[in-house]
């Protein structure tokens, strides 16, 4: 019920949770959808879906509330390379983040235009995602934004590997190892 309060602007969700990899229930999702649609349509949701590969038939909040939700995913957990910090952010093209920027006061819009004026001729038209990328590398260094070449290559290899493994053998092996370790720890 707290999320019905329009003073609450953003919800951060780890789904599935860590370390148990338990996803939000259908009832919980339906309740959240109802709250957003009926009471707080400008609620921004950031969902950390890093552990989704460990949950069968996982369905992200991004697919349930695409307008309101920014998703975060990392290859690092699934492929056991946590030191690499390889991840991605995904956002629907039509989203609350862009629309809220358009609703800012003239003063705030001017501040943002001043911040991003070196990126393009019309900074008011920059999307939230473009601003996020620019801010990830400091606006002045935006021309170097993104991952380094070794990281890009590693993410490409991980993506290709996951596409080739059509029977999810690696995923099942990883889940079996996690279950085995849990049993060893608690039994």
Give residue spans per PLM region.
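Active-site phosphate-binding strand-loop segment of PLP-dependent enzymes
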Residues: 1-57
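Alpha-helix termini
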Residues: 2-6, 33-43, 94-103, 129-130, ...
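Short amphipathic alpha-helices and their capping/turn segments at secondary-structure boundaries
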Residues: 2-6, 33-35, 113, 120-124, ...
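Short, flexible/disordered intra-domain loops and linkers
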Residues: 20-27, 99-104, 168-173
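A general structural detector for well-ordered alpha-helical segments in enzyme core domains, enriched
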Residues: 28-32, 61, 71, 185
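Active-site PLP attachment segment
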Residues: 62-124
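Conserved PLP-dependent catalytic core of the aminotransferase class-I/II
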Residues: 123-187
């Amino acid at each position: 019920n707290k999320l019905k309060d329009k003073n609450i602007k953003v919800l951060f969700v780890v789904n599935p949770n860590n370390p148990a990899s338990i996803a939000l229930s259908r009832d919980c999702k339906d309740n959240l959808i109802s709250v957003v649609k009926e009471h707080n349509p400008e609620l921004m949701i950031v969902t950390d879906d890093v552990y989704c590969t460990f949950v069968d038939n996982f369905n992200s909040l991004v697919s349930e509330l695409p307008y309101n939700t920014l998703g975060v995913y990392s290859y690092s957990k699934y492929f056991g390379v946590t030191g690499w910090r390889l991840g991605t952010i995904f956002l629907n093209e039509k989203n609350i983040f862009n629309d809220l920027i358009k609703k800012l006061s003239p003063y705030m819009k001017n501040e943002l235009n001043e911040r991003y004026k070196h990126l393009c001729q019309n900074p008011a038209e920059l999307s939230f995602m473009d601003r996020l990328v620019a801010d990830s590398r400091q606006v002045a260094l935006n021309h170097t934004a993104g991952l380094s070449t070794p990281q890009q290559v590693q993410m490409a290899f991980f993506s290709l590997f996951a596409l080739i493994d059509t029977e999810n053998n690696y995923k099942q092996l990883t889940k079996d190892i996690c279950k085995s370790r849990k049993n060893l720890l608690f039994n």
